[in-house]
């Protein structure tokens, strides 16, 4: 999987290959279903060499992932990064805890918000920013069952309206 685009430079007469600035590798779709997401934060992630290779090939699952504070640090737990198939016997453990890299002031601010307001810290997506792996964290408040039903019905009605408008425009 390559994330490049070719930009032609007519004046110089050659093509330049630019890597995309942001490449989303995976999103935590359960987070959007189970939480009202409020503020977003960016954190680096400490990975091994085989983990970044598996990440680039898209072999990651964040379905049950969460962030755990421990001794003034943030840890990503239950994120499954599959073993890299070309690594042989030196591969990593797929479900290991991975350290998240943020400034100390940001970590203290996040932990104070989590303690005060009853919010939780949820990993929303993993992406590459200038070829460096990053995790987008979000402060979220848990949804009740009726909130989930409301969002599903709103989404269904919006889809019906879009289909109807599309069908009307198509009939003309």
Swiss-Prot record:
Its main location: cytoplasm. It is found in: Cytoplasm. Keywords: Cytoplasm, RNA-binding. Pfam families: SmpB. GO terms for biological process: trans-translation. Disulfide bonds: none annotated. The keyword RNA-binding applies. It comes from the Bacteria. One of its GO terms (molecular function) is RNA binding. One of its GO terms (cellular component) is cytosol. Required for rescue of stalled ribosomes mediated by trans-translation. Binds to transfer-messenger RNA (tmRNA), required for stable association of tmRNA with ribosomes. tmRNA and SmpB together mimic tRNA shape, replacing the anticodon stem-loop with SmpB. tmRNA is encoded by the ssrA gene; the 2 termini fold to resemble tRNA(Ala) and it encodes a 'tag peptide', a short internal open reading frame. During trans-translation Ala-aminoacylated tmRNA acts like a tRNA, entering the A-site of stalled ribosomes, displacing the stalled mRNA. Belongs to the SmpB family. This is SsrA-binding protein. It comes from Dehalococcoides mccartyi (strain ATCC BAA-2100 / JCM 16839 / KCTC 5957 / BAV1). The lineage of its organism: Bacteria, Bacillati, Chloroflexota, Dehalococcoidia, Dehalococcoidales. The gene is smpB.
